[in-house]
Amino acid sequence: MSHIPISNTIPTKQTDGNGKANISPDKLDPKVSIDMEAPEFKDFAKTMVDFIAEYLENIRERRVLPEVKPGYLKPLIPDAAPEKPEKWQDVMQDIERVIMPGVTHWHSPKFHAYFPTANSYPAIVADMLSGAIACIGFTWIASPACTELEVVMMDWLGKMLELPAEFLACSGGKGGGVIQGTASESTLVALLGAKAKKLKEVKELHPEWDEHTILGKLVGYCSDQAHSSVERAGLLGGVKLRSVQSENHRMRGAALEKAIEQDVAEGLIPFYAVVTLGTTNSCAFDYLDECGPVGNKHNLWIHVDAAYAGSAFICPEYRHLMKGIESADSFNFNPHKWMLVNFDCSAMWLKDPSWVVNAFNVDPLYLKHDMQGSAPDYRHWQIPLGRRFRALKLWFVLRLYGVENLQAHIRRHCNFAKQFGDLCVADSRFELAAEINMGLVCFRLKGSNERNEALLKRINGRGHIHLVPAKIKDVYFLRMAICSRFTQSEDMEYSWKEVSAAADEMEQEQ
C-alpha cells in the first residue's frame, strides 16, 4: 500500500490572515461543550412555541403585505457572523425587529394570492421531530422508518382519494406513491419516466435510429391553461411540448387527438400528456375522461396534475372531477397546499415506477445495502438524492385531524368562495370571469383591462388584503383565493369591503 501523507492543512501560525489568534487543536478542552445544552434548548423551544402560537392566533391583526423595499434587511444585521455565541433571547428579539417587517403573511385570512400553502400545529410539531431525527432517507437502510412510513402514508392518502388500486403499494402490484418536494418536481419526474419508456419502445422498433434522432422527434402535450412548470419540465427534459387550445379553459379529448394526429403526420413521436385538474388561472378541470383514453390509444404517458384541487377529492362530492383517473400513469397533488400539511409535501403516485427508477438509477457502492429490492429506495424516484422525513407531518395531520375534519376544512373554504362570489355579483359594477370552483373566485370590474389593473394596484397598495391577477384570452381579472385555515365568514365580508372601497375610490377620482 502506498503511503498516504497526513494533511498539512492544520493551522500552525499564531494568527490567521486577519490577525486573530488561532487556537491549536491540541489546546481545545474536549470536556467543554460548544453546543446548546438540553435545558437551554427546552427554554428556547418553549419560548419559540409561545411566539408561534401568538403569531398565528393574532396574524389577522398584522398588515398582510410588508411595506419594506428591496435591501431593507442588510442594514439591520452585522456585516459578519459573531465570533462568540450570542444569547437566544437576543435572537428572539430580532425576529420582530429584523424578520417580521419583511414577511408576507401567507396564513392571514386577508391573504388571497396564488393558492394556499398549508399550515397546522400538528404539522409544525412533526417538522420539529423530523429536524431532531435529521435523517437523510435516500435508501431504506438510511432510515427504515422514513421509507416505510412514507409507503404507508401514501397508501392512506390514496385510499382517501379512492385512487385505483394500481396506484397503491398495498395492492401488491407495481404501483406506489412517493412524496416529492413540489408538483413541479412531479411533472418533471413523470416526463423523464415517459421519455425513458418511449426511448426504449422506439429503439426496439427502429434499432437503426440513434438516441439523439429519437429525442428530436419526441413531443408532449398540455392545455394552454397548464402551469408554467409543465413548460419548464419540457425545457429541462430536452423535449418539445405543445400547448393544446382549451375550450372554456378546459382541454378536450378531441383537441388533444387532433394535435397528436397532426404531429404524427409530421413525423414526430407523441409520448406524454399532462392533464390539469384545477388550473392555476381559474381552477378549471381538463376533461380527463376524454383526454386519458386518447392518450392510452396513442400510447402516451398520462400525468395528472391536481396540485391544488386534489385535496378536495377526499370529499365524495368532488370526485366526479377526477373521472377517468384509471387511464392515468401518474397522479400528483399537494397536501402542502390545502390539506393542512406544511410545505413541502407533494404526493405522487405511479402505476409503474420502474420507468422512473430505471431512468434515474445511479448506484454507487456506498449507497448499496443488503435489503435492496425488499423496499423502495426513494432516491431512485426523485431528482435529488437527499430527502427529509416528510411522511411524519402527513402521519401527524391525518391522525390528529382525521378525514372528517380535513373534509370540513375543504368544504368551509369552498363555502367562503361562494360567499365572496355572491357579494361580487350583487354589485352591478363587477362580474365573474370564470365559474367559481373550489376555493377560488375569478372576478373583475366590468370594462377594460386597464381599469382592473388599476383596481388591483389600489387594493394591494392599501395593504389590507393581497390578491394577484391572471389573464385568459386577453381578459385580465383578479383572483380571490381562500388561503387561511383561520378564515371566517366575517373575513370574507372584510375582504369584499376592501375591494368595494378601492372601486369607490377609483370612481371618486374620475
Curated annotation (Swiss-Prot):
SUPFAM superfamilies: PLP-dependent transferases. GO terms for molecular function: 5-hydroxy-L-tryptophan decarboxylase activity; aromatic-L-amino-acid decarboxylase activity; L-dopa decarboxylase activity; pyridoxal phosphate binding. This is Aromatic-L-amino-acid decarboxylase. Changing residue 428 to F: In allele Ddc-R33. Pyridoxal 5'-phosphate binds at residues 183-184, 227, 305, 334. Keywords: Catecholamine biosynthesis, Decarboxylase, Lyase, Pyridoxal phosphate. Substrate binds at residues 117, 227. Residues 1-17 have a biased composition (Polar residues). Induction: By ecdysone. In larval epidermis, expression is rapidly induced. In adult epidermis expression responds to a pulse of hormone and there is a time lag between initial exposure and appearance of DDC. Disruption phenotype: Simultaneous knockdown of Ddc and myc restores increased dopamine levels and the induced male-male courtship observed in the single myc knockdown. The gene is Ddc. The active site is at 227. Its EC number is 4.1.1.28. Gene3D superfamilies: Aspartate Aminotransferase, domain 1 (3.90.1150.10), dopa decarboxylase, N-terminal domain (1.20.1340.10), Type I PLP-dependent aspartate aminotransferase-like (Major domain) (3.40.640.10). Changing residue 390 to M: In allele Ddc-Ore. Belongs to the group II decarboxylase family. InterPro entries: Aromatic_deC (IPR010977), PyrdxlP-dep_de-COase (IPR002129), PyrdxlP-dep_Trfase (IPR015424), PyrdxlP-dep_Trfase_major (IPR015421), PyrdxlP-dep_Trfase_small (IPR015422), Pyridoxal-P_BS (IPR021115). The modification N6-(pyridoxal phosphate)lysine is found at residue 337. Hypoderm isoform is expressed only in hypodermal epithelium and the CNS isoform only in central nervous system. Expressed in the adult head (at protein level). It comes from the Eukaryota. Signal peptide: none annotated. Homodimer. It is an enzyme of class 4 (lyase).
